[in-house]
Regions:
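Glycan-recognition surfaces
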Residues: 252, 256-271, 347-364, 409-510
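Aromatic-lined carbohydrate-binding/catalytic grooves of carbohydrate-active enzymes
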Residues: 169-170, 174-271, 347-370, 374-400
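Glycine-rich, aromatic-flanked loop segments that form ligand/cofactor-binding clefts
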Residues: 139-160, 193-202, 226-269, 339-341, ...
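Extended Gly/Ser/Thr-rich low-complexity repeat segments
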Residues: 6-18, 292-307, 333-352
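Intrinsically disordered, low-complexity segments enriched in serine, threonine, and glycine
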Residues: 328-336, 340, 586-701
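Autoprocessing Asn-cyclization modules and mimics
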Residues: 247, 251-335
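Carbohydrate-recognition beta-sandwich/jelly-roll modules
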Residues: 1-200, 233, 240-241, 379-380, ...
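Carbohydrate-binding surfaces of carbohydrate-active enzymes
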Residues: 227-251, 264-271, 426, 490, ...
Length: 701
């Protein structure tokens, strides 16, 4: 092409097909009963997708739910992991598409909740060199064919123990996330091993700043050498170590910001000042307010003029346009005088109170991060906030730019065993990353946090040849064995990994920690060895069902469904003589068995607990529960009283025969005396019954 500068776009396709059984929108592969067609971008500047948006940001929604394959801009449905890119459904089948944009000229786009945002000029050769691969093959060779294309075309092809990450059973291995220091790393390694896991992920304050990635002295006082020794200790015990990265987010304390701000900090746009500024001015006259008065995503309200950063509260409502109530020399920069006509730029920021990067600075930061990995031997990374790299003006191209540069700078040894995850992907980034994963399990209970989001995304992963992941789960001092096994069963059912976030203090405080860690290791062994059959996996994918395993010998476990009946007994105020008990109905689905149960005093104290089974057998439990305490019975000759954090506090003898239930329907009348109770006081009563037992053997045994 001799006049590449005159060509704005090269569009590959759309290539329409009649195939519609499985459409991998991100991977760019559509599959029918026997035959698959695919498209692959062969370099980073060739984007999977179509220029639906001038910003090169691909639509993010579940197009399969929407039902309208023509509307690429619907209202968001919360399915943020979905990206309509290289493949999409059509009314008659599907289409494959890719494109490349000429970026020699500055453009104005919409992004980051800004109606006007400068996309800087970027010289990557323009559309010259854009290329794709189109392939067709039997369905069962689809993934293998992509792997061959990667190797033939020199695309990223990361490995795990020498095997392509996309086909490695270890690609979605579970891992422990915890805070540790040079002093406490041995304990963190021991906990990882106790849980039967092989990956330990640092999640304290790893870095003093984001940008230069200087290690935090409070946790790594010996800097690079200190972290390297932590990695070596873990490696010696078969544990790989990784950490968290907020991608191109730059903290205000970073040398890219202070004391002299880097000119490559991302900008919303620029104007000029219309009058001289002395060192005391708190109002700044500007020629145009266009890039300064967009407040939807304006978290730091910072402008750059020369080497000075200035924060402002607002823009005047009328001419002459002024930035109001300015704080001079923000973030430790130097207050200076400025002449009329000097360029003033609004810096682009993020809700995490950080600045972002232009493309050249993204590349430099990526190399710094790769240098850290090469020097320390870290082998796992999570690129959190990759969407921040759209600050480059490159859209999804920018999202791939940081991990692509980072990966290319890594040593050959690291590339031989590497796990790369992120909370999002793009068509090209698919080649680099190992798996999708995401965090923020903080706002709800173990079973409620992002539940629908976790499970709905599994179909997206499967149709795009991605290892399944369920995201992060947070273990607290009050997490129960039942909660953990609920999650572990979903992990096994979906063949999906997860991250367990657990600080050392919570693990130490939780009285069930030993059992929890053992169960994690046992379930993970069985999952990674593909020991569960398809029928068991299907059952475990049911969100409303619970399952448990019990080790019965070397390499073998009893697996069964657990039928959990959860009831609430509330304090009642009635006429004298009127019953105050609650009646609960349940069904024992299989054999005669001893019922197991838990009684939790939610927000009150109780005593004189009684259970009347089937209107003839009354069992008095001579125990008093304080608010938060839990009475557990697991079928033995004792009932156990625990604190809210699982610390055993008392045991009482019982006769197991009293709790024997035949197969079929039953009723239980629950009663107690409330102490120190409010009007809304309640007691939680859960009965647990075991279904048919199946023996599961470790495939490696």
């Amino acid at each position: 092409m001799t006049t590449a500068e005159a060509v704005d776009l090269v569009i590959w396709g759309p290539y329409f097909t009649k195939i519609n059984k499985i459409i991998g929108e991100t991977a760019g592969v559509v599959r029918g009963e026997n035959f698959a067609l695919g498209i692959q971008s062969l370099n980073i500047k060739t984007l999977g997708g179509y220029p639906w948006n001038e910003s090169d940001r691909m639509p993010e929604f579940d197009i399969f739910r929407q039902g309208n394959d023509q509307n690429m801009h619907p209202e968001t449905d919360g399915s943020v992991l979905y990206r309509i890119e290289a493949a999409k459904p059509t009314g008659q089948g599907s289409s494959l598409q890719a494109y490349c944009r000429n970026r020699f000229k500055e453009r104005i786009v919409e992004d980051f909740d800004h109606d006007r945002l400068i996309a800087p000029a970027y010289d990557d050769g323009g559309v010259t060199g854009s290329k794709i691969a189109i392939f067709g093959c039997p369905v069962d060779l689809s993934l293998e064919t992509i792997g061959m294309i990667e190797l033939t075309e020199g695309l990223p092809h990361p490995l795990i123990d020498g095997k392509w990450a996309k086909t490695s059973a270890q690609a979605n291995a579970a891992y422990l996330i915890t805070a540790f220091t040079e002093e406490t790393v041995d304990h963190a390694i021991a906990l990882t091993k106790k849980a039967g896991l092989k990956y330990l992920y640092h999640y304290g304050k790893t870095f003093e700043n984001w940008g230069h990635f200087d290690l935090y002295k409070g946790e790594f006082p010996n800097g690079i050498e200190g972290l390297k020794k932590c990695v070596e200790k873990a490696e010696a015990q078969g544990i790989k170590m990784g950490t968290h990265c907020l991608s191109n987010f730059i903290s205000p304390n970073d040398p890219y910001v202070t004391p002299i701000p880097d000119l490559r900090l991302a900008k919303v746009g620029s104007s000029v000042i219309t009058g001289d500024l002395d060192a005391t001015a708190t109002e700044i006259p500007i020629e145009s307010p266009d890039f300064f008065n967009q407040m939807k995503n304006n978290h730091l309200k910072t402008v750059m003029i020369g080497d000075e950063l200035i924060r402002y509260s607002s823009v005047s409502k009328e001419t002459p346009w002024r930035l109001m109530d300015c704080q001079r020399g923000a973030f430790g920069t130097f207050v200076s005088q400025h002449k009329a006509g000097t360029i003033i730029s609004k810096l682009l920021d993020h809700g995490y109170k950080v600045f972002l990067t232009e493309a050249d600075l993204t590349i430099e930061m990526s190399r710094k991060l790769a240098e850290l990995y090469n020097e320390t031997g870290l082998r796992q990374i999570s690129f959190d906030g990759l969407e921040g790299n759209r600050s480059t003006g490159l859209g999804t191209y920018g999202e791939s730019l940081m991990p692509y540069t980072w990966f290319n700078e890594l040593s050959a040894d690291l590339k031989d065993h590497l796990i790369i995850d992120a909370s999002r992907t793009t068509h090209f980034f698919w080649h680099i990353y190992t798996r999708m994963n995401w965090g923020e399990p903080w706002y709800a209970g173990f079973r409620e946090s992002q539940t629908e989001y976790r499970f709905n995304n599994q179909a997206y992963f499967k149709r795009n040849f991605m290892p399944g992941m369920l995201g992060w789960f947070r273990m607290t001092s009050e997490t129960t064995i039942e909660d953990i096994e609920w999650m572990l069963a979903k992990s096994a059912g979906y063949e999906a990994g997860y991250a367990l976030v657990a600080d050392m203090e919570s693990i130490a405080q939780n009285g069930f920690s030993e059992k929890i860690l053992q169960q994690i290791g046992d379930w993970e062994q069985l999952r990674l060895s593909n020991s569960f059959n398809d029928g068991q996996k299907l059952k475990m994918r049911n969100n409303s069902k619970e399952f448990s395993i019990q080790r019965v010998g070397e390499g073998s476990w009893n697996w069964s469904e657990v039928f959990s009946y959860k009831f609430v007994h509330t304090q009642k105020f009635r006429q004298p003589g009127e019953p105050l008990f609650s009646t609960f109905n349940l069904d024992n689905p299989c054999r005669e068995q001893i019922m197991q149960f838990m009684i939790t005093a939610s927000n009150c104290d109780i005593h004189l607990v009684s259970l009347e089974i089937d209107n003839y057998k009354t069992i008095q439990l001579p125990v008093a529960l304080k608010a938060g305490q839990i009475l557990r019975y697991t079928g033995s000759v004792e009932v156990e009283l625990y604190s809210s954090t699982g610390q055993l506090q008392e045991t009482l003898p019982v006769d197991p025969k009293d709790f024997l239930l035949r197969e079929g329907a039953h009723s239980i009348q629950f009663d107690c005396v409330f102490d120190k109770a409010e009007k809304e006081s309640e007691v939680k009563f859960e009965v647990r019954l075991t279904g048919e037992i199946e023996v599961v053997r470790h495939n490696g045994s």
